[in-house]
């Protein structure tokens, strides 16, 4: 229950504080992997609480893993950075896939 409430609070903050920016694709040097920045985490979660970060990371992992299995994309890893949550794929993800991940995280209920 606590985890659900925290996720709801994060989602509510996201809808109140910012209008979601467009996802940004950046190519890593010397690698075929693509890093996809989903949203500016600092502007959504204003606390540095480890518990909140763990809940948020689990939420992102589950959403992206589910979408990867549905679209047969190959997931390499998900990284929760200081400024952003990102996931890395073996091949360049489609814009539709990025949009679906982005939308699913913000519209999680």
Curated annotation (Swiss-Prot):
Stretch forming the signal peptide: 1-16
Protein name, as recorded: U16-hexatoxin-Hi1a
Residue positions assigned to the propeptide: 17-43
UniProt main location, coarse: secreted
Keywords: Cleavage on pair of basic residues, Disulfide bond, Ion channel impairing toxin, Secreted, Signal, Toxin
Any one GO molecular-function label of the UniProt entry: toxin activity
Gene Ontology cellular-component terms listed: extracellular region
Keyword Signal: yes
UniProt modification remark: Contains 2 disulfide bonds.
Entry's localization field: Secreted
Expression across tissues: Expressed by the venom gland.
Protein task: Probable ion channel inhibitor.
Lineage top rank: taxon: Eukaryota
